[in-house]
Amino acid sequence: MGTRDDEYDYLFKVVLIGDSGVGKSNLLSRFTRNEFNLESKSTIGVEFATRSIQVDGKTIKAQIWDTAGQERYRAITSAYYRGAVGALLVYDIAKHLTYENVERWLKELRDHADSNIVIMLVGNKSDLRHLRAVPTDEARAFAEKNGLSFIETSALDSTNVEAAFQTILTEIYRIVSQKQMSDRRENDMSPSNNVVPIHVPPTTENKPKVQCCQNI
């Protein structure tokens, strides 16, 4: 049973990055609306869509942002990355140049996004296996070397699209919830929370002194 879109426990912003034409918009539409458009044109500017999933009984609302990979849209970079807690870095398994550019996209992401952002490398268009130009093992090794998770997907036939988003959102949730638990523990152990106020009656030194020998 689905939840109302305005009822959620966590809201996570996830960005899609990578060269134009690698299938970012179709990954977004496949996950959020279960749609695929063969005539999909390059995204102009920025668009985002939302979908909620359940993790550990909590409702996670994913706000997934998509933008064109072409150089002329670079001006939106800072606003695009601001507040993002996850990123899918997408390349086309049938176009090696889109994989070569992953390193540049990763640098831009790390220059502009939060240092703790969760990143997944996504080899899209796995249905084009007969045209494969990027070996799976090569991409997986790159991901491991750079601390990224890795998956191959096909927005066309839906392969691993659900798994990609579920995996990154679950990882973000684990990190956020662990941080919340850690923060609570620190608060519980902080000196201010262990102080028991003690009322100390005024000592004789603090009592007002009675002046004597007046009016003599």
Swiss-Prot record:
Function: The small GTPases Rab are key regulators of intracellular membrane trafficking, from the formation of transport vesicles to their fusion with membranes. Rabs cycle between an inactive GDP-bound form and an active GTP-bound form that is able to recruit to membranes different set of downstream effectors directly responsible for vesicle formation, movement, tethering and fusion. The small Rab GTPase RAB11A regulates endocytic recycling.
InterPro entries with a match to the protein in the record: P-loop_NTPase, Rab_GTPases_membrane_traffic, Small_GTP-bd, Small_GTPase
Quaternary structure (record): Interacts (GTP-bound form) with RAB11FIPs (via their C-termini) including RAB11FIP1, RAB11FIP2, RAB11FIP3, RAB11FIP4 and RAB11FIP5 effectors. Interacts with RAB11FIP5 and STXBP6. Interacts with SGSM1, SGSM2 and SGSM3. Interacts with EXOC6 in a GTP-dependent manner. Forms a complex with RAB11FIP3 and dynein intermediate chain DYNC1LI1; the interaction between RAB11A1 and RAB11FIP3 is direct; the complex regulates endocytic trafficking. Interacts with EVI5; EVI5 and RAB11FIP3 may be mutually exclusive and compete for binding RAB11A. Interacts with STXBP6. Interacts with VIPAS39.
Amino acids binding GTP: 20-26, 37-38, 40, 42-43, 69, 124-125, 127, 155-156
Outcome of swapping K41A: Mildly decreases SH3BP5-mediated guanine nucleotide exchange
Motif Switch 1 location, chain numbering: 36-47
Ranges spanned by the short sequence motif Switch 2, renumbered to the chain: 67-86
Record: residues binding Mg(2+): S25, T43, D66
Single GO term (MF): syntaxin binding
UniProt EC number: 3.6.5.2
Cofactor: Mg(2+)
A cellular component annotation (GO) from this entry: transport vesicle
Record-annotated membrane-spanning stretches: none
Modified-residue entries (N-acetylglycine), positions: G2
Record's keyword terms, sorted: Acetylation, Cell cycle, Cell membrane, Cytoplasmic vesicle, Endosome, Glycoprotein, Golgi apparatus, GTP-binding, Hydrolase, Lipoprotein, Membrane, Methylation, Nucleotide-binding, Prenylation, Protein transport, Transport
Record-given protein name: Ras-related protein Rab-11A
Record note on what altering K24R does: Impairs protein folding and decreases affinity for guanine nucleotides
Region (Disordered): 183-211
